[in-house]
Amino acid sequence: MHKINKRNLILFLIFLPFLSNKKILASQKKPNLVVIWKKKRVLALYNRDKLIKAYRIRLGFNPKGQKQKEGDGRTPEGKYFITHKNPYSKFFLSLGLNYPNQADKTRAAGKGNNPGSDIYIHGLGKKNIFLHYLFDWTNGCIAVTNKEIEEIYKKVDSGTVVYIYS
């Protein structure tokens, strides 16, 4: 067994606070909240009130306003949660949301509409990454690059709360 040199131990303890970068530590934490701002085209991962990382996103092809019905091309707004992870998505990887929630169902029913379903946070699959940065292209989902969804997929667990704001 090795004997610890006191001098080296003291030096290590003195410099430890400088070695532990807060950004590195924050990025290693599991997010307990996902916040999406449609207008800003941003998805942010939080652990408690600390930002872990933010990503540029693309939305449904008709992004303004609350999703009203199936096929309207809008991304829903409200409180959701991650229901499941799909490693076999045609968009590389995806995280399913509990859309429609009760508020969505009630709103759609009041207008005689089907609210739709299958809203995900997903990658590009085989879509062109350059087109991804030019315009909103999904049917209502939230899209990031394949590299980004791989990172998000590893960090975010089923049950994580997702807020989507206009």
Label each PLM-derived region with a short phrase.
Residues 27-63:
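A structural motif detector for short, solvent-exposed N-terminal "entry" segments of globular domains
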Residues 1-4, 15:
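Secretory targeting signals
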Residues 6-10:
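N-terminal export leaders
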Residues 43-45, 53, 64-67, 90-93, ...:
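Short, solvent-exposed loop/turn elements at domain surfaces
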Residues 13-22:
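Hydrophobic h-region of N-terminal signal peptides that target proteins for export
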Residues 33, 54-56, 79, 118, ...:
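Well-ordered beta-strand positions in beta-sheet-rich domains
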Residues 27-32, 59-83, 105-107, 146-147:
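N-terminal post-signal-peptidase region of extra-cytosolic proteins
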Residues 29, 84-166:
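Exported/periplasmic cell-wall-interacting domains
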